[in-house]
Regions:
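Long, contiguous internal "core" modules enriched in hydrophobic/ aromatic residues
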Residues: 1-265
């Protein structure tokens, strides 16, 4: 599922950088264009400090910018990944637009950047991901923030060889998760012992709710089902138990994927 998490990471970066550029311009530094001073899109006044994250987040972003502009990388003790596009802009242009900057930001820093946006900016991004008219704007924003945090932690768990069944989903907004799961999840999945068992299923549902691309949705479903099919019961046509129980995937959930999304048969 890593490639689908990467797809959503790139989508978040694209949507965030578009909103920031549209609202606050394309220069990372305040510049005078001859007709007046143009402020930076990283100006503190453009962001909310409701969770006391503004200064630390902007500092993290600025560290990447400074590193990209320092040819000898002598600034500070940290090392950062600098994309070829950011390196090009840092050395050949007089500004670095946000859609270039995000190519070198980690998923974590990008998520923090989203978290310090003003409410109206978050709403634009949340609405572009989630189009369900039955959810309020606040519910969409809450779901997007917690969902992005969860799949980021899930990716980090996979990358470090951790147990995917340890994913903590207790804080995921249940109403939105159930509403956007197309019937794949219900309230029982978020009660008692089912909370741990439903972790991977919740991750899959979140990915499907945020991808917003039919081809990618079908590809994700097909990948999950193909892998699950390797462990089906040998004497029936149903999805079997065993390793997939340990992963928190049920036959009911997998059959739901086939029925709800009409995935190609295998």
């Amino acid at each position: 599922m890593l490639k689908y998490i990467l797809y959503i990471e790139r989508a978040l970066k694209s949507k965030l950088s578009y909103v920031v550029a549209d609202r606050y311009g394309v220069s990372e530094e305040a510049i005078d264009d001859g007709s007046g001073l143009i402020s930076s899109y990283l100006d503190r006044k453009n962001y909310s400090n409701s969770h006391n994250l503004r200064d630390t987040t902007l500092r993290s972003i600025t560290e990447v910018l400074d590193y990209s502009k320092d040819a000898e990388h002598t600034i500070g003790n940290k090392k950062f990944y600098i994309s070829s596009s950011l390196r090009h802009y840092a050395t050949r242009h007089n500004h670095i637009p946000p859609w270039i900057l995000v190519t070198s930001l980690s998923f974590g820093v990008t998520t923090q950047w989203y978290s310090i946006l003003r409410s109206a900016d978050k709403t634009r991004i949340a609405n572009s991901f989630i189009r369900d008219p039955q959810l309020t704007e606040d519910e969409k924003k809450e779901y997007l923030k917690t969902s992005i945090d969860l799949i980021r932690r899930y990716r980090n768990t996979l990358a470090h060889g951790g147990k995917t069944t340890d994913i903590f989903i207790g804080r995921i907004p249940k109403k939105q998760c159930i509403q956007l799961s197309n019937g794949l999840l219900c309230r029982d999945d978020f009660t008692g012992d089912n909370i741990t068992q439903s972790g991977v299923q919740t991750v899959i549902s979140i990915l499907l709710s945020l991808i917003n691309d039919q081809y990618m949705e079908n590809a994700l479903i097909q990948d999950v089902i193909n892998l699950f099919w390797l462990y089906r019961s040998r004497d029936t046509d149903s999805f079997g138990k065993g390793i997939w129980d340990d992963l928190g995937l049920s036959g009911e959930f997998m059959n739901g994927l086939l029925q709800v999304y009409s995935a190609p048969s295998i």
